[in-house]
């Protein structure tokens, strides 16, 4: 668990790497980033950042990778060194260092992991972190919370965390389109075919690859899902979308159920945190599906504010 240099001014290590303040100052370490379930005691005169995570495939490092990189870059920019540490110095700290190399040195996921292994042969990230690093690479090494890839990842992580969903974090819900003004919007709007209530926008559609098998997510390789097909899937009879604010009452405390129009209560589709199969054969987890036959597409014309329904 001692400190091992990966780059000039960047060290990786385990729990013991901070046991000697003398060793830290001898190495010029001015900042320590700890990725562990518990926050360690502070070392005097050393900047500290803590990311709470266990070494489990279901732990989320991805959403914190940009913050981690900024913290490490700031320490090194001032001429000091930074140490990234976890308990064993094998998986969590290695994943964060690899992400930093990807973002700052332009390395791909495999190259970055190989670079850390060259310095520390026992380095071995768990399969969940491997998938998160691939996803980070697919997003151009910056966490884009509006991207389809990230939205799907976040929902997948949520679905694995609970057997009975209680309260869902606000950020997983798309804003109800009835609450936003319609002008200057190039997005397509989807509304209930029966009562015309606006339900969701095209940016909420989480497209998937056609065909058999599960969608590739955190624990699997995501290289497939990076090559997403567009929304022109002929074989798919449903739209799979992110949750929208109006669905919240239906989702509380249950694993699956129907999705009804909040205005006229006609059946639009269904949801399941365990996942559901699309008509094209692809298994999607979790699934929030709206039958295409139950909604109309509305395109906003760039001139003025007239809505034109696609017949």
Go through the PLM ranges and name each one.
Residues 31, 270-277:
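Conserved tryptophan-centered aromatic signature that marks the ligand-binding surface of SH3
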Residues 251-267:
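Cys/His-rich Zn2+-binding "zinc-finger" mini-domains, especially FYVE domains
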Residues 2-39:
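Glycine-rich, flexible N-terminal cofactor/catalytic loop recognition
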Residues 66-81, 98-240, 244-256, 272, ...:
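PTP/DSP superfamily signal
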Residues 18-22, 37-42, 47-78, 103:
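Short polar/charged helix/loop
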Residues 91, 200, 269, 283-286:
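Short functional micro-motifs and their immediate structural scaffolds
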Residues 90-96:
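Glycine-rich nucleophile elbow surrounding the catalytic serine of serine-hydrolase chemistry
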Residues 192-195, 260-264, 277-280:
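Short cysteine-rich clusters marking metal-coordination/redox-active sites
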């Amino acid at each position: 668990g001692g400190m091992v240099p990966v780059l000039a001014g960047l060290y990786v290590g385990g729990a013991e790497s901070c046991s000697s303040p003398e060793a830290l100052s001898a190495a010029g370490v001015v900042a320590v980033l700890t990725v562990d379930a518990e926050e360690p005691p502070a070392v005097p005169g050393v900047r500290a950042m803590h990311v709470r995570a266990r070494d489990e495939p279901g732990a989320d490092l991805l959403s914190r990778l940009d913050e981690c990189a900024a913290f490490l870059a700031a320490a090194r920019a001032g001429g000091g060194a930074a140490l990234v540490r976890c308990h064993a110095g094998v998986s969590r700290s290695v994943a964060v260092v690899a992400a930093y190399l990807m973002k700052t040195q332009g390395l791909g996921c495999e190259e970055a992991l190989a670079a850390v292994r060259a310095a520390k042969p026992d380095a071995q990230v768990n399969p969940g972190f491997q998938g998160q690093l691939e996803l980070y690479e697919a997003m151009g090494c910056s966490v884009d919370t509006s991207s389809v890839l990230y939205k799907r990842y976040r929902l997948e992580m949520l679905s694995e965390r609970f057997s009975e969903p209680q309260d869902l974090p606000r950020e997983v819900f798309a804003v109800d389109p009835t609450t936003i003004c319609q002008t200057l919007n190039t997005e397509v709007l989807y509304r209930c075919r029966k009562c015309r209530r606006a339900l969701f926008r095209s940016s909420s559609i989480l497209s998937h690859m056609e065909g058999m098998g599960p969608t590739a997510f955190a624990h699997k390789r995501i290289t497939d899902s990076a090559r997403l097909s567009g929304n022109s899937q002929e074989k798919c009879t449903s739209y799979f979308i992110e949750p929208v604010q109006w669905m919240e009452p239906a989702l509380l405390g249950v694993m699956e159920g129907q999705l009804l129009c909040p205005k006229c209560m006609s059946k639009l589709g269904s949801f399941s945190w365990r996942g559901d199969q699309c008509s094209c054969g692809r298994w999607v987890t979790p699934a929030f599906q709206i039958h295409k036959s139950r909604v109309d597409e509305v395109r906003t014309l760039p001139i003025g504010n007239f809505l034109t329904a696609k017949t």
